[in-house]
A protein has these predicted regions:
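PLD/PLD-like phosphodiesterase catalytic module centered on the HKD motif
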Residues: 2-8, 21-26, 34-136
């Protein structure tokens, strides 16, 4: 829930598009699969890499049912090599091997398996006042 008007406009447009089976709408605030979700995640990871390169710290938390998308796995590995601290909370299949020196040493993976399947995802990039959180 939000009172943000831009998010409300995007949400309204999203549901309009769903009614006409348009999967490729243009949104300012929403990250929608299949069109913009992957691209926006990769851009956000790149932003954390740039923070580390400029002397700040980079931080990523991702919570999802699975992590199998090769381009995102490669980008997370690149971020780890750059020094970004990454915590992944993955319920099911996770195709990244954490803790490999020089490759995924800054990645930790937690697996939460319970009786009930959860469908929400949470992506957090950055820390403190600069963090951005995306929830679905």
């Amino acid at each position: 829930m939000t009172a943000d008007r831009e998010t409300g406009k995007d949400t309204n447009e999203f549901f309009r598009n769903m009614m006409i089976s348009n999967l490729y709408g243009s949104y300012n605030r929403l990250w929608v699969a299949p069109d913009s979700l992957k691209r926006n995640i990769i851009d956000a990871i790149d932003s954390e890499i740039e923070k580390v390169k400029s002397g700040s710290s980079g931080y990523i938390i991702m919570k999802a049912n699975s992590l199998t998308e090769r381009s995102i796995i490669d980008k997370l590995s690149e971020a780890s090599c750059a020094g970004v601290e990454i915590n992944l909370i993955i319920r099911g299949i996770c195709c990244i091997l954490p803790g490999i020196e020089g490759y995924t040493e800054n990645i930790r993976v937690f697996s939460l398996v319970g009786r009930f399947l959860e469908h929400h995802r949470v992506y957090m990039f950055g820390q403190k006042d600069e963090r951005k959180i995306y929830i679905s």
